[in-house]
Amino acid sequence: MSSYFVNPLYSKYKAAAAAAAAAGEAINPTYYDCHFVPEVGGRHAAAAAALQLYGNSAAGFPHAPPQAHAHPHPSPPPSGTGCGGRDGRGQEYFHPGGGSPAAAYQAAPPPPPHPPPPPPPPPCGGIACHGEPAKFYGYDNLQRQPIFTTQQEAELVQYPDCKSSSGNIGEDPDHLNQSSSPSQMFPWMRPQAAPGRRRGRQTYSRFQTLELEKEFLFNPYLTRKRRIEVSHALALTERQVKIWFQNRRMKWKKENNKDKFPVSRQEVKDGETKKEAQELEEDRAEGLTN
């Protein structure tokens, strides 16, 4: 089909190549012989062979033999005979330059190889492979808000003598002041026994007060062993139990108008009976006057 276009170009190129060779000019090395592809050349060769074989009896048959149409892509004839038949005139007609179509196809340069695939990217080692961590999600870093407000800082600065913890009482105060800054202190971290300040009032629950009152009525003075037992039972310290009993004895003295607290339970009972007798006498005196 395309021989009408390829053959004139081929003849012109041959003439130009001969003229260039006579003038001493170099021919483009990228040129290759423009023969047909084996499939196209095979089609024309099969048609020429059929014409040679059935040429004498083709006039009596209106149609071509069915074998020619049964195979759309016939294989090329053997290399011993020509492409156009026994004398090879069909081959010379379609390929005047000589050589078989298979040889011309093999003489053509191979297509360039495909470029190798790019190597896989290295495994990601965290956020480092994505650039800056600040711009990882397209947002800037959030500004950290200060923990303390100006009012809280002012309150903490008022107590520079506070220590970082109550367990460092035996250490040097100068060393503690240098190691701990006021911005790291919280109100609940302040020790109870700070110098120059009054201690907060200790509050007792209803259950603790009731148990302490029972113990006081049983014995106003506690031994060391009993004080430890009471402090463990009520989840208090020995010092808190000791102070509570001291305050309770002072209260009893004020209520009974006595300078000395009774040592034994018998003295307590005697004092109560005397107090009841005095109250009865006062009531009788008021009744007589009325």
From Swiss-Prot:
It is found in: Nucleus. Residues 255-278 have a biased composition (Basic and acidic residues). Residues 60-127, 161-201, 255-290 are annotated as: Disordered. SMART domains: HOX. Residues 60-69 have a biased composition (Low complexity). Residues 197-256 bind DNA. Keywords: Developmental protein, DNA-binding, Homeobox, Nucleus, Transcription, Transcription regulation. One of its GO terms (biological process) is regulation of transcription by RNA polymerase II. Pfam families: Homeodomain. GO terms for molecular function: DNA-binding transcription factor activity, RNA polymerase II-specific; RNA polymerase II transcription regulatory region sequence-specific DNA binding. GO terms for cellular component: nucleus. CDD domains: homeodomain. Belongs to the Antp homeobox family. Sequence-specific transcription factor which is part of a developmental regulatory system that provides cells with specific positional identities on the anterior-posterior axis. This is Homeobox protein Hox-D8. The lineage of its organism: Eukaryota, Metazoa, Chordata, Craniata, Vertebrata.
